[in-house]
């Protein structure tokens, strides 16, 4: 879009009567938690994007504006703040529409312009081809993310929608994007605690790269779950009944499904047949308080047989991405093995929404759980950049950091240590008493 086409739109005094009506699917969600003033600002952002992308089409032939609208819908599920919503609607205008950042800043504020600029820099990266120029872009991206974690949120939602519609790209591009998503954006979502988005990104990428394997696993899971549904339902009801009988009134007991890509990786990692991987069924217990978490643990251990060395306390010491829960494995009906995760509802929200769970419209405290941890990780990227001798070394270090898994060590004294995968453990026997 040439900026001379819509000079009036680049003015703060653009009349409200000229604003393009928001799609009803957006407006209905916005009015559930935002006020009139914020919605009007978002409507102006939509108007800007609508005219900026006028005449542009997506690969499937649809109007381009449908993409930022669908990205915004994903972000609205997280109930993000108005600036994030505005940035999502306009996230492609710098790259695709000849719009200048300083004009966005004048109209929508510096935060919105900086988020869009950060998302644009992320979009220019090719993580499969780390060369000097691309590594320089990665440095700029790390700085943008460290300044405002909302850059990551908008970009993850952008990538998720692109993966949902990836079938319209050439096959070579599909493979490239899927590989990049598995290696970069999935781990990035994990780093900031966005578990639901991470799971969908992984499954969509896996389906694109290995459609036959995906089909086989989906079919096997469907046939397997049908035969055991009665047992699972019976265990769920028993768990609920025991908790209620012991005054845990508001407990919710749900089945816990693993995403297909994680099942596939578990089969490869453990070298076990599919039937053994699915022998263990997962349940999640949601309660109101931390005290209820530990009480619930004692109750279910009293009625079912705990499996030795299968208890983990991530409430006492959370994972680095903010995840908190009690994990235990039990032998239920007829020695049927089950895995149980116990969380407060707040912990569950954090586990699924990550930094967005505490960003929300009304919560602006960046010193809370997952946001603080994400900010610390992003700040560590800046330290990494300073220690790297050149941009390429920095880019390689980031890829290794995203790819690294953590191993949690539980000591006999109940201490929990987070170690990098591959770390060596040295055991020193206690000195004899003198």
Model-inferred region functions:
Residues 417-423:
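Short, contiguous acidic and Ser/Thr-rich linear segments
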């Amino acid at each position: 879009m040439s900026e001379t086409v819509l000079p009036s739109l680049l003015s703060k005094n653009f009349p409200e009567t000229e604003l393009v009506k928001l799609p009803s699917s957006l407006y209905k969600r916005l009015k559930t938690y935002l006020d009139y003033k914020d919605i009007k600002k978002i409507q102006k952002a939509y108007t800007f994007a609508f005219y900026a992308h006028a005449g542009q089409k997506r690969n499937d032939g649809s109007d381009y504006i449908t993409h930022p609208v669908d990205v915004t819908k994903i972000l609205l599920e997280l109930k993000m703040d108005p600036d994030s919503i505005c940035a999502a609607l306009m996230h492609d205008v710098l790259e695709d529409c000849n719009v200048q950042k300083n004009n966005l800043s004048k109209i929508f504020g510096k935060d919105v312009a900086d988020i869009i600029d950060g998302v644009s820099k992320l979009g220019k990266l090719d993580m499969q081809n780390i060369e000097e120029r691309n590594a320089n872009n990665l440095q700029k991206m790390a700085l943008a993310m460290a300044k405002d974690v909302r850059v990551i949120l908008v970009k993850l939602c952008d990538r998720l929608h692109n993966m949902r519609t990836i079938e319209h790209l050439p096959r070579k591009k599909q493979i490239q994007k899927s590989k990049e998503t598995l290696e970069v954006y999935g781990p990035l979502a994990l780093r900031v605690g966005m578990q639901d988005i991470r799971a969908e990104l992984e499954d969509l990428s896996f389906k694109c790269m290995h459609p036959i394997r995906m089909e086989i696993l989906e079919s096997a899971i469907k046939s397997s779950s049908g035969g055991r549904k009665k047992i699972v339902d019976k265990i769920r009801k028993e768990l609920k009944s025991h908790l209620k009988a012991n005054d845990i009134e508001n407990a919710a007991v749900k089945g816990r499904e693993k995403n297909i890509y994680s099942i596939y990786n578990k089969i490869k990692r453990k070298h076990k047949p599919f039937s053994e991987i699915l022998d263990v069924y997962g349940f999640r217990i949601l309660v109101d308080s931390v005290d209820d978490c530990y009480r619930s643990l004692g109750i279910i251990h009293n009625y079912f047989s705990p499996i030795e060395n299968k208890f983990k306390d991530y409430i006492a010491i959370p994972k680095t991405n903010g995840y908190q829960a009690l994990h235990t494995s039990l032998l239920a009906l007829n020695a049927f093995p089950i895995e149980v995760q116990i969380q407060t509802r707040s912990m569950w929200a954090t586990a699924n929404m990550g930094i967005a769970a505490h960003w929300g419209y009304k919560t602006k405290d960046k010193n809370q759980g997952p946001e603080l941890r994400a900010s610390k990780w992003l700040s560590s990227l800046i330290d990494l950049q300073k220690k790297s001798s050149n941009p390429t070394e920095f880019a390689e270090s980031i890829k290794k950091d995203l790819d690294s898994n953590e191993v949690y060590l539980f000591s006999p004294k109940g201490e929990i240590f987070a170690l990098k995968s591959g770390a060596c453990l040295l055991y020193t026997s206690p000195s004899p008493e003198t």
